[in-house]
Amino acid sequence: MDSSGGAYLNVDAIWSKVGFVRLLQMLFGCTTFSLVLHRAGFSAAYGTFCVFVWAFCFALTILIVTCELTRLQSCLRSISWGNFTAAYAMLATLMTLTAAVIYPMYFTSLNCSSSDCSTKYFRLAVSVCAALLFVTYAVEVFLTRAKPGQPCSYMATASGLLKVVQAFVACVIFGALASESQYKKFVATQWCVAVYSFCFGVTMVVVILNITGRALSLCCPFERFVVIYTVLAILMYISAAVIWPVYFFDSKYGSAKRPSRCTWGQCPWDSQLAVTIFTHINLILYIADLIYTQRLRIVAQR
């Protein structure tokens, strides 16, 4: 017989603000991919990615709600539940935002493709539900974020949330690199790929250490390790932010203008531009991470 005390079910997992938002996530998530599979349809890698995002987020949200409702998360000794849910909410926000942009861009049209307009209406409904799904995950991030004067998990802080965004942006960069980017053309651009890979790897280690609750078991202070790594990542990203555009958009090596005969979706110039943009975005994210961490340290010492 269970002697742990307290009710078997945690009603707050549903009736709290966060619980209600998660119920909406399950509703919109299930509705979105059900509409796609029923009539709206999808094709190619873009459509498959969108359906995967909606199904993955729906399944994992159900798992989180079930664990919190039945208090099963207390049995997961190897996981820091607060860090896990905060990191997942941020990741789901980014993934659903991407899907909410991609699906309407490639599959939704205001014109009917045939005499039957039902497919158009289904795809419009999918686009609306996908946008609402993104909003619900963004609201969860807002509700569970770290608040001044309250104890919180590291992944719920601005620094922790930025780590998830940095890793996600790196994945976008890897996707662009794999799509006709021609990064092997120069040794210098291969260095840029090494920068992206190294920073992504260390960022993932930081996230995993927090989710598994092993961040405090390091031989050196975790916060100091993160600050040192962030400074190194900024320096490395600065080099990539300079090198990549020079070797692909300077007239000596490449072209500053998009080739007129470049096919949409198969154009190396487009991939190179995407890498450039997201490299600068990640550089800004790492700088913001360092500024926030330093400001938090100064406030804590007062």
UniProtKB/Swiss-Prot annotation:
Residues 13-149, 154-298 form the MARVEL domain. It is a multi-pass membrane protein. Belongs to the MAL family. Keywords: Membrane, Repeat, Transmembrane, Transmembrane helix. This is Myeloid-associated differentiation marker-like protein 2. InterPro entries: Marvel, MYADM-like. GO terms for cellular component: membrane. It is found in: Membrane. The keyword Transmembrane applies. The chain crosses the membrane at residues 45-65, 87-107, 124-144, 158-178, 191-211, 225-245, 273-293. PROSITE patterns: MARVEL. It comes from Xenopus laevis (African clawed frog).
